[in-house]
Amino acid sequence: MSKLSFRARALDAAKPLPIYRGKDMPDLNDCVSINRAVPQMPTGMEKEEESEHHLQRAISAQQVFREKKESMVIPVPEAESNVNYYNRLYKGEFKQPKQFIHIQPFNLDNEQPDYDMDSEDETLLNRLNRKMEIKPLQFEIMIDRLEKASSNQLVTLQEAKLLLNEDDYLIKAVYDYWVRKRKNCRGPSLIPQIKQEKRDGSTNNDPYVAFRRRTEKMQTRKNRKNDEASYEKMLKLRREFSRAITILEMIKRREKTKRELLHLTLEVVEKRYHLGDYGGEILNEVKVNRSEKELYASPATLHNGNHHKVQECKTKHPHHLSLKEEASDVVRQKKKYPKKPKAEAGIAPQQPTPETLPVINKSDIKQYDFQSSDEDEFPQVLSPASEAEEENDPDGSCAFRRRAGCQYYAPRLDQANNHMCENSELADLDKLRYKHCLTTLTVPRRCIGFARRRIGRGGRVIMDRISTEHDPVLKQIDPEMLNGFSSSSQTIDFSSNFSRTNASSKPCENRLSLSEILSNIRSCRLQCFQPRLLNVQDIDSEECTSRKPGQTVSSKRVSAASVALLNTSKNGISVTGGITEEQFQTHQQQLVQMQRQQLAQLHQKQQSQHSSQQTHPKAQGSSTSDCMSKTLDSASAHFAASAVVSAPVPSRSEGSKEQNTGHNNMNGVVQPSGPSKTLYSTNMALSSSPGISAVQLVRTVGHTTTNHLIPALCTSSPQTLPMNNSCLTNAVHLNNVSVVSPVNVHINTRTSAPSPTALKLATVAASMDRVPKVTPSSAISSIARENHEPERLGLNGLAETTVAMEVT
């Protein structure tokens, strides 16, 4: 070899090592010139530490002098030892433990607070322990929570009460001490904090930063793992741990309850021992004298081992349970779990007889009977219905399914249907109750087909409709055609003649025509339902008899069912139908138009009469009677009859009482006085327009052959009509007219002496041949009706003056 070289190689165990003898080894001076390519081994220090002054001096001195100099060493602070002080702090009683590293698995230690107590805190703690017991750890936790909840601004006392779950006195004392100590402290917090490096780089040259973050390096190689699977495993592990913790908490609570029960049992035994109750007589007396609680609809669940006895009574009604007084057994009986027979599908549960009713003994409900750990009962989970059963069920997906954890009671057939089954007539009525029949509505007037009426929540009437093949024909039926048919209780179940059809089904060949359906209704073979209309006179008579003297009736008491329709008869016009709000408004507008025309005609006649009085003063009476005496035609009579208010005729005793009061009013013309009263919104069309007086029509006066209407015109002020004392002496005569008004107005009236207009009206009526005379008794009777029923007035408001009205 031309040049001696040496390279460090890894040792090979299979290659034998060369052995050199001492005489064969070269001299050290010869080996110095050998170029050794030895890699520099890491020193274990950072570059800044390697360049330290003392370290470099020591290394260079060793290389130069080939030995270690005493002066060339790295300076190290001297370690001082004080043995006496150490022995005083740590006693020499040391025992070597069995193991130095002790790990408690599954031990979840609470997080220790960051705050540490000092001597000042110990002084406060000793003072607080005189009144209440508080541990140092509890005090540190309270101060730590207050410190972490407040940054630059301190928390208030109310916020501290929400943070600390302690006594109010303790919270107040600790809070005041903490606020005082925090203000005296110069630092930002009572908890000493280590200064750390900030991410913005402002603390790079700060020598007080104790810990600095490592420089983030790029990871050149990635270990590809299934992160999702590991995440799921961690979630599963967390759920298992939380479940284990929950089970342990429940076991802890159960054992604590059992311990309390044991202590109570021992106390009872000690009391019985001191009282000498060895046979249990005193204990039985205490149990008997205790008042039994009522059994409610939802029985309370007993937390003991006798759950199976309560489960047997779940399907029974609580009223069928009975308690049997028996002496409590000393020996605990073994529990029995009877198997319940499976009920066949489609069979309803039968109502239990009194012989088969379960009897709950008081001895079964033990006072100290609790469920231990080995008596876990699992609730019976009902198996879901199979697909075949769901397909066969007519309700499909909406079928009733029992829900776990709910108690279902059997229907009480003894109260629901027993009285129906005993009485055959009631049973027939109960069958008719669930039939669908042809139904018509009043508002709107139409036929809705076959329906069944039932009562819903709050007393609402609900109509359940059924689809039949006769619906296209039934829609053509006019409800007026069904008014003349009389209902009969002997009806045939027409529902069996038709079947339910879908929209896609073909029309049935056996569909009845409209004439056949009407003939079936007329012959009572088909049941037809129509809302019954109440008679106004019946309602008024009932209210008059039930009402006390002086008591008024509300204006809202007349419902829509009391409104009748107009039907013609031989004796005249009878009202049996209803009016809507639009018809009422139209009628009011027509009355206003008629009133304006009458006022214009009266004004013209007054001017003509005034001119004729100057020329022919003697012929004034005859001309006036000739020009103003007119009768109504049929159309005007119908129109005026629709606005007349009628009331039931009071008894003779009532009329005689009112006759003796001294009110002398003739022909039913009443002059009301006093302030007017605003009515409902339908009268605003008349009351809002100035110069137009409201219309008040006086009730009809009963007669043997004919009914007479004397309409009156009521004005809001005497200035509206300047003919208060004029010669309006004509009366209106209607033959064969009797009306019923659907409107009742609650109002008070006051009568006065008859006006000259009323006296002239009575004189002209007596002189006319076509108008029969109105007797004073009938007039007083009408006035008595006015006084007895002040709530019934016309369609519009009050007025202070009453004058006659002429209808043309």
UniProtKB/Swiss-Prot annotation:
Region annotated Disordered, chain positions: 337-357, 371-397, 595-630, 645-682
Keywords assigned by UniProt, alphabetized: Chromatin regulator, DNA damage, DNA repair, Isopeptide bond, Nucleus, Phosphoprotein, Transcription, Transcription regulation, Ubl conjugation
Subcellular location(s) of the protein: Nucleus
Modified residues (Phosphoserine): 755
GO biological process: chromatin organization; DNA repair; positive regulation of DNA-templated transcription; positive regulation of double-strand break repair via homologous recombination; regulation of apoptotic process; regulation of cell cycle; regulation of double-strand break repair; regulation of transcription by RNA polymerase II
Stretches assigned to coiled coil: none
Residue spans of biased composition, Polar residues class: 615-630, 658-682
Superkingdom in the source lineage: Eukaryota
Cross-link Glycyl lysine isopeptide (Lys-Gly) (interchain with G-Cter in SUMO2) placement: 135, 195, 324, 362
Disulfide bonds: none
Function text: May play a role in transcription or DNA repair.
UniProt family annotation: Belongs to the enhancer of polycomb family.
PANTHER family in the record: ENHANCER OF POLYCOMB (PTHR14898)
Protein name, per record: Enhancer of polycomb homolog 2
